[in-house]
Every structure is written in C-alpha cells, then in structure tokens.
Amino acid sequence: MENIMTLPKIKQVRAWFTGGATAEKGAGGGDYHDQGANHWIDDHIATPMSKYRDYEQSRQSFGINVLGTLVVEVEAENGQTGFAVSTAGEMGCFIVEKHLNRFIEGKCVSDIKLIHDQMLSATLYYSGSGGLVMNTISCVDLALWDLFGKVVGLPVYKLLGGAVRDEIQFYATGARPDLAKEMGFIGGKMPTHWGPHDGDAGIRKDAAMVADMREKCGEDFWLMLDCWMSQDVNYATKLAHACAPYNLKWIEECLPPQQYESYRELKRNAPVGMMVTSGEHHGTLQSFRTLSETGIDIMQPDVGWCGGLTTLVEIAAIAKSRGQLVVPHGSSVYSHHAVITFTNTPFSEFLMTSPDCSTMRPQFDPILLNEPVPVNGRIHKSVLDKPGFGVELNRDCNLKRPYSH
C-alpha cells in the first residue's frame, strides 16, 4: 500500500487590519477604494448616494473607504502559514478572533469545505445576504486555500484541477481606456458619472464620454460602462440605447443587487448585442443563482466578498450550466488562480489603481509583495507557479491585531 501524505492540522488563526476610518486616507491594500487625493477612483463617480448633493462629488465622502483592509493568517502545526486580504477591517478581525476561530483551529489544512460550511451556517443569523460578514468569511477561505497550497507545494490553480488555457487576457477598469489600449489590454471599462437624479442631461454626458473614447480607441477595442448600482431600470435602458451607436460591449451593475426583476427587464430591453452584467455586490451562492435566472450575460462575483474561492467555484458552475460567462470583479491573484481553471472565463478584469491610470500598479499595493501585473494585457500561467497564491504579506503596513483568543 502506498504511503499517503500526512497533512498537519491548523494551530491558530489570527486577524489584523490596516487603514479604514481610524487611519489617514490613502492606505490602499485590500480596501483599494482607500486612495489618496486626486485619484480617478474617487472622482465624481455615480453611486446610490449621488442623489444627495452633499455626497455626489466623492465616494469617500459617504464612507466607501471606512472599513479598511482585513488580513487573515492561518498557521499549521508544522509552522507553515497561509494568508489573504479583503475589505472588512477591524470589525472583520472581531468576527474571526471571537467567532470563526472555533471552526478553524484543530481542523486539517485540507478541511476547507467543512470549515466553509460551518462558517456560513454559524453566521447565518447575522450575515443576511452578504456584506461585512461574507467579506470576512471570504478572507478566511482564501487564507485556507493559500495554506493548503503551501503545505502540499502546489499553486492554488493546480489544486482546482489545473489550467484550461496558457494565459489570462485582461481588460482594464479605469478612467482612461485609451491608455489601457496602449498597454495591451483588450478593452477598457469606465465608471459612469451621472445618474437618474441628473435626468436626460446625465445620459447625454455619459454617452458623450463613450463617444469620445470610441474615437480615441478605434472600432475594435472593447468599451464598457460600470454603473455601480446607481441607476433605475428606465434610466439604464435609455443610457444603454444612447451608447449603442458607439458599440458599447456591456453595461454593468446598473441596479442594486436585489432588483432581480429589473435586471430581467433591462436584459430584455437592452440593445441587441449589448451585454448586461452584474454580481460584484452579490454575497451568497443563492443570490447568484437568482441573478443567473434573470438571463444576464456575465456574472461578476468578487472572490473576496462572495464567500471566497470555495463559493466562486460553485458560482462558475451555475453560470456554465446556463451558458453564461463568469468574469470576477478584480481581486488580483485570488481571481487569477480561479479563472485560469474556468472554461467560461475567456478574459478577466484588471483594476487600475494608479491615480491617473498611466502606470501598472498592483491592485492590492502595498499589502501584497510579489503581486503580478499583466504584461501587454496578459499573465502567463507560469507566473502563477508558486505554492498557494504565490504572494507574501507586507508586514510593514502598520498591521494592528485588536483582538486575540
């Protein structure tokens, strides 16, 4: 009988945070909205709060960056560690150290699905349909996958069954698709700046932005709009048709997450050939099943918010069963290792975090070390050939551990 590798148990889980409401703004990291002044990501982008004039100019004005970065580290009995980052800050630390720890410590490093189900079941009474608790669970789940990969000496994508393509090709999200084209990306996604409270004038302004970028980028470069939950179905439908002459590839997250009937109506009324996409702020497997049933073209879960890699794999299966694409929202290496194994993810998103989109800055800078960025719009699978997720934690980021157990 052949010997089977003996896997260690998990000795301890620890949680830190950095940035957030108690820190100077601009920490970046897992909370990538937390950027300094004069950054495109905080420049009059339409949001659900834009209808209030006091909060329309800046997303930070209503507190988009108050949570900060959560760092979860799991240590095995043999001393090896895995870690991950997400957006949950100090409150996420409390959930990990005071509640979730009991489901993690003492388990085998391979017991990821068991731990995941126990975390979901135990928090159901206060987690609702996602949000902060799901961000925290996602971070733990990713840290467990990182540890498992390091213990067995394999990259996470090989733990999932291996790559189905040699490289990942990317589109860029940011304010300058024209610069993204020069960098080799296949497309550029811009934020909208106006919403229903601006009336038809807002539609004309955002459509003019698309027209300007179409002229700069040429006919074959993808252009998309990210509406960040800021619209209603009538406004979104009118905006989609206003942008149709400029070959807009898709219109994204026009509506709040739970407005499934409105998503179904938007898909039904959108211009022929224009895709409707959403999912970034959906936080449970069940919500993605319902979203899939609306008939949208692409589901866009964030692996750091939807329940982690364990849930992302299940979401991809739901999408595949309906002939839909799954293209995760940003998330750097945590997405890379997943999507290179998905047959229904022909491309992925790279979020431009440099202030003016003119340089290639890693998404989670400075919290991750050795975080890869696309070269000519692509990342080859060989770049991912390191144990776990292949990145290291930058412990010089003023990490604070407010709780212990």
UniProtKB/Swiss-Prot annotation:
Annotated protein name in UniProt: L-rhamnonate dehydratase
Catalytic reaction annotation: L-rhamnonate = 2-dehydro-3-deoxy-L-rhamnonate + H2O
Active site: 329
InterPro entries hit by this protein: Enolase-like_C_sf (IPR036849), Enolase-like_N (IPR029017), Enolase_C-like (IPR029065), L-Rhamnon_dehydrat (IPR023444), Mandel_Rmase/mucon_lact_enz_CS (IPR018110), Mandelate_racemase_C (IPR013342), Mandelate_racemase_N_dom (IPR013341), RHMD-like (IPR046945)
MF GO annotations: L-rhamnonate dehydratase activity; magnesium ion binding
NCBIfam families in alphabetical order: PRK15440.1 (NF011968)
UniProt site (Transition state stabilizer): 349
Enzyme Commission no: 4.2.1.90
Function statement: Catalyzes the dehydration of L-rhamnonate to 2-keto-3-deoxy-L-rhamnonate (KDR).
Positions bearing the site annotation: Increases basicity of active site His: 302
Assigned protein family: Belongs to the mandelate racemase/muconate lactonizing enzyme family. RhamD subfamily.
List of residues binding substrate: 33, 59, 349
Assembly mode: Homooctamer; tetramer of dimers.
Top-level lineage group: Bacteria
Pfam families, A to Z: MR_MLE_C (PF13378), MR_MLE_N (PF02746)
Keyword Lyase: yes
UniProt entry keywords in alphabetical sequence: Lyase, Magnesium, Metal-binding
Record-level GO BP terms: amino acid catabolic process; carbohydrate catabolic process
Gene that encodes it: rhmD
Cofactor(s) listed: Mg(2+)
